[in-house]
């Protein structure tokens, strides 16, 4: 479930292009333009010293933490230089001064390893924190043998139910219960969990015009484009109605496992471009937010979206 937490965190941290931000007069600054915040600049430029500039990378000068990070990159400004903060389980190099392991961990044998008790958030991907030993342990391959208390005790492709079992995400059809999580429903099929009946339903408001989320039946109201100032209803976390997104998410999860990524950082994770392409294909905020459209077109996403 760590991947899901990362995705939701990214969505929530974005300055979402919601209906009340839909502005036909909105423009974005090119490199060298004046700015106040990152969203004033055409991606991937960021606002540094009130000027749209390239993102500060490790070892470059900075004045504050946000100079060294995009939403999903764990960076910090230390003594006027950008450092990358590496998650537990990710590869590290103690000789590189511009990188450091996250708190409660240190670089041992080329891997950031915990040196104190674990919690629900600091174990590596597909490991969980054992309540008794307070040590990270691998999630068992036999899903049926798992007795879970939280999503973090299940594989990234599963969620934990109230009956303490791991079930696969998006497995409940229309009319079936979604009492444990909205992600039991097939959100990439335009379906949603009805909060009153706790059953999956087809969202009849999907992609219909909206003023705010009160008319979206539990989904988000997002700006379709800044040109026409039109907003539409989408999934509860911005999901688009695209059946292939489940498969694309599974490919991304497998990439994270293969590459041993524990954070979706553009600096430390080789799956980052694949993640961006997944977001563009499957999330409305990424798809329709004009300040990123040119950047996404340059990524050549077809190599990820058609990869078996």
Swiss-Prot record:
Top-rank taxon, per record: Eukaryota
Glycosylation sites: 25, 300
Coiled coil regions in record: none
GO cellular component term, pick one: extracellular region
Localization (cell): Secreted
InterPro entries to which the protein is assigned, alphabetical: Diff-Dev_Assoc_Protein (IPR052326)
Keywords: Glycoprotein, Secreted, Signal
Secretion signal, residue range per the UniProt entry: 1-19
Protein name, as recorded: Uncharacterized protein DDB_G0272512
Species of the source: Dictyostelium discoideum
Lineage: Eukaryota, Amoebozoa, Evosea, Eumycetozoa, Dictyostelia
């Amino acid at each position: 479930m760590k991947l899901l937490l990362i995705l939701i965190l990214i969505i929530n941290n974005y300055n979402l292009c919601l209906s009340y931000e839909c502005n036909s007069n909105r423009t974005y600054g090119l490199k060298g333009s004046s700015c106040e915040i990152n969203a004033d600049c055409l991606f991937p430029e960021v606002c540094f010293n009130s000027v749209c500039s390239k993102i500060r990378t490790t070892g470059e000068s900075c004045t504050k933490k946000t100079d060294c990070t995009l939403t999903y990159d764990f960076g910090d400004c230390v003594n006027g230089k950008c450092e990358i903060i590496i998650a537990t389980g990710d590869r590290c190099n103690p000789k590189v001064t511009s990188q450091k392991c996250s708190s409660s961990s240190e670089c041992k044998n080329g891997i950031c390893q915990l040196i104190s008790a674990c919690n629900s958030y600091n174990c590596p991907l597909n490991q969980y924190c054992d309540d008794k030993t307070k040590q990270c342990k691998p999630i068992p391959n036999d899903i049926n043998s798992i007795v879970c208390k939280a999503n973090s005790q299940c594989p990234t492709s599963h969620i934990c139910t109230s009956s303490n079992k791991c079930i696969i995400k998006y497995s409940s059809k229309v009319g079936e219960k979604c009492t444990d999580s909205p992600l039991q429903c097939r959100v990439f099929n335009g379906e949603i969990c009805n909060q009153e009946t706790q059953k999956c339903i087809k969202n009849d408001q999907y992609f219909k015009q909206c003023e705010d989320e009160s008319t979206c039946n539990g989904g988000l109201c997002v700006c379709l484009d800044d040109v026409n100032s039109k907003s539409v209803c989408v999934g509860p976390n911005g999901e688009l109605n695209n059946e292939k997104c489940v498969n694309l998410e599974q490919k991304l999860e497998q990439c994270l496992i293969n590459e041993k990524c524990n954070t979706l950082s553009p600096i430390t994770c080789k799956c980052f471009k694949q993640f961006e392409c997944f977001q563009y294909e499957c999330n409305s905020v990424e798809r329709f937010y004009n300040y990123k459209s040119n950047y996404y077109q340059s990524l050549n996403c077809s190599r990820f979206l058609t990869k078996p």
